[in-house]
Amino acid sequence: MRTADATADRCRDVYEIIEPDQRFAGKDRGIMLLEEKFLEFHRYASSHNLPLEAISVGDENKVLCEMHYAANAPRNIYSHTKSFTVTAVGLAMEEGKLSLEDHVAEVFEDKLPSNPDPNLEKIQLKHLLCMSSGFGKALLMNADRRPGIGAPDYEKYMMAQPVPVEPGSAFCYSSADSILAAHMVERAVGKRMGEYLYEKVFQPLDMGWPLWEHDPQGHPNGGGGMYLTCTEMMKLGQLYLAEGNWKGKQIVSRDWVQEVSTPKFTFEPSADPWHVGYGYQFWISPYPGSYRADGAFGQITTILPEKGLVVSIQCPERGNFDQVKRALHEHFLMEL
C-alpha cells in the first residue's frame, strides 16, 4: 500500500528536486500546467488529511496524472454504476431493440398485479433514466436491498408500487428507476447486463469482467454495486469525453453522448455547488459543458469536454466527503 506520505516523498523527488527546465523538458505546456495543478492539489489533500483513496486525470486516450492513497484495488463504485447502465441503454437503442418511449407496464406485463396504479402505464424508459418515474420516493436503495426489501423479484415488487406523481413531472432520485431500466435492456437484448456490457464496453475498454452485485434472481444491479479501480472507472469518462469513440472505434453514438449529458432537470442554486442538474443517469456539474458519474461516498468521474479532461476520484466510506468535494471544486477543478 502506498501511503500519502510516501506518495508525497515521491512527488518531491520528481517535481521539486529536478530543476524546472529539466522537469518539463519536451512536454506540452498544457500538460506542464496540469501536472503543477495536480501536485498542488495533492499537497493540499495531504496537508488537510482529505479522505481520498485515489485520484486520476486523463484525456481521451491515456492517464495523465494519478495518485493513490490506499491499495490500488477494485472497490464498490455505488451509483457510478448507473452511468454504465445508461450506456447499455444507448447501445440497445442503437441496435433498434429499445426506445426511450417504451412503456414499463408493457415490458413487464407478466409482472403486473391485478390492480396496478393507473399511472404505471404512463411510465416510459425516458422517465426512469432521468429519475422522474413518478413512484415518488427512493426505492431499492442499498438500505432497502440489504434487509431483503423487494426480494426475490424486484420487477414484481416495483409493478405493485403506487405511482402518486405524474411520470416525467418531478425529479426523485431512486435506484429502482435504474434497476428497471437495466432489466428493460436485458429483456430487449436477451442477455444479462454483465454479458452485454462485457461484449460492448468492458472488453473493448480492457476492463476485464468487473465484480458486480446481483439481485436474488441473478440480474446485475443497474443502480450500483460494480467494483472498479479508479483508472478503470475513469475509462467510462474517457469514452464519453471522446464522444463515444475508443481508440478509433465508435462504441457509443455521439448523439447518445449528447443526450445523456443534456440536463433534463435543473435545480435551484444551493450551498452545494455540484447540485446543478440531472441528465440521463449522469449529474450535471458546475463547469462549462461538464457532467459526472456519481457514486456514494465519493466515487466520481467528472467529464470536462471544454478542457479535454476527465477527473476521477475514489473515497472511503468513512470520513467527510463534503470536505473532499469542496477541496476538489475549489482547489483543482475550478483551477483547470
Predicted regions and their residues:
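Active-site SXXK
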Residues: 61, 76-101, 128, 181-185, ...
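Short, charged, amphipathic alpha-helices and their helix-cap/turn boundaries
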Residues: 63, 141-167, 191-210
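Active-site helix/loop module of the DD-peptidase/beta-lactamase fold
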Residues: 97-135, 160, 188-228
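Active-site Gly/Thr loop motif
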Residues: 209, 258-310
